[in-house]
Design a protein with these regions (language model features):
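Intrinsic disorder at enzyme termini
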Residues: 1-12
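Glycine-rich flavin
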Residues: 24-138
Length: 138
């Protein structure tokens, strides 16, 4: 096993997310799965921990943590539910960090700030008419 040499902040982050997942997240996910129900409040609960902005710089309302920290958060979410791990990965990694890297300052203020707080949820289109789920053809 590789020793990642986690910082005390990263260890605290893992412990907080693990506790949240077991206490708040897992029971609700299990009940929703049995009922075939999606509860949009689950993302709001993730936002209450600041997870939607985990890697966003503090000036945009995020924690300003590194990608390893995002991976640690995602690993803890994955233990409970792959859907919300995917949602967070897309929100932060695919969309958010793309905006941070290439967007104008105006766009960052418009999108990253509300994304960091969880007021806006990022997504992307994987399936399009006449292209199916072939992203390369979109």
């Amino acid at each position: 096993m590789v020793d990642l040499g986690l910082t005390s902040d990263q260890e605290q982050l893992v412990a907080a997310v693990r506790d949240f997942c077991q206490r708040e997240f897992a029971p609700q996910i299990a009940a929703n799965d049995r009922a075939g129900h999606h509860d949009p409040e689950i993302f709001a609960k993730l936002a209450s921990l600041g997870l939607p902005g985990v890697c966003f710089p503090q000036r945009y309302g995020g924690y300003g943590l590194d990608y390893l920290s995002l991976g640690l958060v995602c690993e803890e979410l994955e233990y409970v539910d792959t859907v919300y791990r995917t949602v967070l990965s897309v929100h932060v990694g695919l969309v958010g960090m793309g905006l941070y890297t290439w967007a104008s300052e105006e766009q960052k203020q418009q999108w990253l700030v509300p994304m960091a707080s969880g007021k806006k949820l990022a997504c992307y289109g994987l399936t399009e008419p006449n292209a199916g789920s072939d992203v390369a053809s979109m």
